[in-house]
Every structure is written in C-alpha cells, then in structure tokens.
Amino acid sequence: MPPRPQRLAPVADLPPVFAGIDEAGRGCLAGPVVAAAVILPQEYALPGLTDSKKLTAARRESLAEGIRSCAVTWGIGVVWPRDIDRINILQATFRAMARAVRVLRQPPPAILIDGDKTLPPHVLTSLSCDGHLPTQRAIIGGDGCIPAISAASILAKTFRDRLMDTLDRRYHGYGFAKHKGYGTAEHLAAIAAHGPCAQHRLTFRGVRPNPAAEEQLTLW
C-alpha cells in the first residue's frame, strides 16, 4: 500500500536530502500542467518562503530568482493539453512531476510531494537510478510547511504563468495572460464566443461539456 499522507512533517522526521515537489495549473481549462522539483541546501536565505498562492506575483518572481540561485538543483516538468486529454489530469500531473525529478542534476534519495497522493508504481519506476528508487511521502499542506515544497510551488507557478503570457500572444481573444487558463467568467465567455483553441483541455467541463468532462473532475 502507498504511504499514508501526512498533514505536517516535523523537521526531525524529514530525510536529510530530498526533493520537494509541487504542481501548478491542475485545475485550469487551458494550458499545461507544470510541476517543479527542488533540492535546497542545508542553509539558505529565502525569507518569506511559503505557498505560492499566498504571495503576490512580484514576490513570487523575486523568490523564484533566489530559489534558482541557491538550490542544489531544480527541475521543471510540463505536460500539455493534448496529453492531459489523452491520459487524464491526474496521470498528467504525475507525469509532469516525474519529468521534473528526472531533469535534476542529481537523483534525490527521497521525494516529498504536496497533497495527498504519491506517485503510482509505474511512474515511480521511471525514476530508478542504478536500481534504486526514491522513497516518497505525500504531505497535505506541504507547500506551506516544507521549504523545498514551497520552493517547488513557486517555481512551478512562475514558470507556468510565463508560459500562459506567451500563449496569450499566440492565441488572441481568450485572456490567457490575465486568468492563466483558469475557468473565470471572462474565460468561459471567450470559449463560448470563439470556441476552444489548441491550448484548451477538451475533456474539461466548461470547454466541451460531455461525460468525459465530468470524469476529469473526479480524478483528483
């Protein structure tokens, strides 16, 4: 059985070296789901490091620069809408997390994931290094209490926001730069007026309502 998620992980209980993992964009109607993995050094100076959702955009960008500078290693994983529709958002999120871990300069002996789910066996196996798999733990609220997970949440969010700004310049009329792909009233009105574009998740309710869309909403 997978390890039970924890609500808090006291510092004494943390492995000595681990990668914190978090995602951004899971609930959006458009754009990719992005995950980040971060290994922080034993000592670092990143005052105000916390869950990215509690920070202003300017503060996130400032912290992201500091994280990239001081991290032992960090990585980003991206899965685009076509694959999200094909394998579902839960599996796409797992895939993005695995991709983020695989691009780290050193394989982590352990990974701590924000939320209540760990990587399934078929995804975890892809992270094997010299026959060894990282241990893993899911920590509910980890982005607010584990600095490496907080750092991952910030890198994932800032990276994805910049991607959505770029997509806004390519796909006019949807307001991606403003709402970042979330299902705001403005975004839903744009979909109704123009129809979905190549960056929309066609299996999500609000983009193209159908039975599969309802299924997507129950997978996390």
UniProtKB/Swiss-Prot annotation:
- Where, by residue number, does a divalent metal cation bind? 22-23, 114
Where the record annotates domain RNase H type-2, the positions are 16-216
Does the keyword field hold Metal-binding?
Answer: yes
- Keyword annotations: Cytoplasm, Endonuclease, Hydrolase, Manganese, Metal-binding, Nuclease
Q: From which lineage does this chain's organism come?
A: Bacteria, Pseudomonadati, Thermodesulfobacteriota, Desulfovibrionia, Desulfovibrionales
- This chain's source organism reads Nitratidesulfovibrio vulgaris (strain ATCC 29579 / DSM 644 / CCUG 34227 / NCIMB 8303 / VKM B-1760 / Hildenborough) (Desulfovibrio vulgaris)
| Function recorded in the entry | Endonuclease that specifically degrades the RNA of RNA-DNA hybrids.
Catalytic reactions on record? Endonucleolytic cleavage to 5'-phosphomonoester
* Source superkingdom: Bacteria
**UniProt cross-references to SUPFAM superfamilies, sorted A to Z:** Ribonuclease H-like
Cellular component GO terms held in the UniProt record: cytoplasm; ribonuclease H2 complex
Database matches in NCBIfam families: PRK00015.1-3
Q: Tell me where in or outside the cell this protein is found.
A: Cytoplasm
PROSITE patterns named in the record: RNASE_H_2 (PS51975)
Full protein name: Ribonuclease HII
Question: HAMAP family recorded for this chain?
Answer: RNase_HII_B (MF_00052_B)
Pfam families noted in UniProt? RNase_HII
Instruction: Quote the cofactor binding remark.
Output: Manganese or magnesium. Binds 1 divalent metal ion per monomer in the absence of substrate. May bind a second metal ion after substrate binding.
Q: Name one GO molecular function term.
A: RNA binding
> Which cofactors are required for activity?
Mn(2+); Mg(2+)
One GO biological process term is:
mismatch repair
Query: Main site of residence?
Result: cytoplasm
Indicate yes or no for the key word Protein transport: no
